[in-house]
Amino acid sequence: MSKTPIQLSDHFTCRKLICFTLPSITMIIFTAIYGVVDGFFVSNYAGKTPFAAVNLIIPVLLILGSVGFMFGTGGGALIAKTMGQGDHQRANNIFSLIVYASAACGVVLAALGFLILRPAAVLMGAEGELLEQALIYGRINLIALPFYVLQYEFQCLFATAEKPRLGLFVTVAAGVANMVLDALFVGVFSWGAAGAAAATAISQCIGGVAPLVYFARPNSSLLRLGKCRMDLRALGKTCSNGSSEFMSNVSMSLVSMLYNVQLMKYAGEDGISAYGVLMYVSMVFQAIFVGYSVGVAPIESYHLGAENHRELRGLLRRSLGLLAVCAACMFAAGQVLAAPLSRLYVGYDPGLFEMTSHAFGIFSFSFLFSGFAIYGSSFFTALNDGLTSAIIAFLRTLVFQVGAVLTFPLLWKLDGIWLSIVAAEVMAVITTAIFLLAKRMR
């Protein structure tokens, strides 16, 4: 890495892009590992039913927490653009405003979560022990929801503040705490789903509070948390900018709930457990795409504000090349690791292992395509074009995935559910390419 600090105003080669975005990529991976570690310990130390319960209720928690990603991506794009225009005072005002607004939203959403948790679990078909385990896991996590929202938000804003390495440090600290506490609460104390939830909640508190302390004190970053004046226009622009990421996260969670309903119909609890393994691995693999998109977004927004369109075109071209290489590597890894990763989670049950390994082999084809749609949506957000970004996110999840998961099983039964994920990503890439070409022609 270069000894000279990388700045948003720099010219970015592929090497410099990797250097700048690597902390964001690692940061998002560690966040994804929270769920992966929970799943590993619950599955191997508590059994299939608690594991299925965790997988069943996680989409509800992700929907509530995704407001943090909306504020982080939407606000980060607006802050970076404002700094590119040279107005650092207004950039700091917007930064403080969105942090306070997101914290307030987190409190309100946590209260809402306690009201809807049981009805949502019942709606997805949970009953008996499956229902009780899901409620235990969900309620404990809801206590920490405001901190989860802040953690999600700061993952984006650290890059905007030109402090991606500090963001990585905070996320790694929270992730390590989660792993250690999971081993203690679930592996040693045998607290099951409750222990996994407590470990996650504590780690989210670490990830949310540490950035607050840093930005509230004098620091060497571009941003400082302090008093702010209400700016409804900036708040509205933040929400509209980040609406695509919010919609994408909410839609993916709703789609996961629909997948769970379909899997209960075609394969029962084993189907949900197999899908859970796929989602855990997918979160880590796709975290590379999400992390890159989060890391490069403030660069794109800055050069948009500075009206450096030549650099913007270069960033897009180099990003697509890097994503293509990464997609091929992840597909190859998915094919090779299908059996070992399935065995890691469900090796104790031969039937479930066979189902999961088979599903993984089909599902890994989605890695060839998913990164381009993720980046495409983020690219338009960085350009402050929230509408196009939202359309891509909406089509990718609520149209393509819902349509595929409802129709494909009619033709191919259980395999149709796994194939539907791949088909949806292919259609999303085609849609993204159309929007990018249209933007280039304009």
For each of these PLM feature ranges, what is it?
Residues S9-A46, P59-G74, L78, A103-A110, ...:
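N-terminal transmembrane alpha-helices
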Residues C19-D38, I140, A174, S203-G207, ...:
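Transmembrane helical elements of multi-pass membrane transporters/channels
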Residues S24-A32, F69, A101-A110, A144-V149, ...:
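Hydrophobic alpha-helical transmembrane segments in multi-pass membrane proteins
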Residues I33-F51, A121-G128, L184-W191, S253-V284, ...:
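Helix-terminus/linker motif at the lipid-water interface of multi-pass membrane proteins
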Residues F51-A111, Y148-G167, A274-A338, S370-I392:
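Small-residue-rich hydrophobic transmembrane alpha-helices
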Residues G72, I140-A159, V170-N178, A196-V209, ...:
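Short runs within selected transmembrane alpha-helices of multi-pass transporters and secretion channels
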